[in-house]
Amino acid sequence: DYDKDMLIDSVIMKTSKKLKNISYPRLIMIIRGELKTYFIPNENNVKHRINRLIQLGYIKINDESKMYEYIP
């Protein structure tokens, strides 16, 4: 499970860094597309990983647009 969490984290960070702003549905679609050759991530686990990255200060939620933003 630890390896899966690290893979999910890396895709979230790579995607948010590349796009700067991203909606939740699009982020889920990209994560599943990137990881489908390894495993299909559980949506609850993805939500947990996003919340963890928010707590660590890597990404944040824009209150107006409800999109995730990369924090450089």
Q: What would you call each of these model-derived segments?
A:
Residues 54-64:
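A short, conserved structural fragment
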Residues 21-24, 42, 62:
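Conserved tryptophan-centered aromatic signature that marks the ligand-binding surface of SH3
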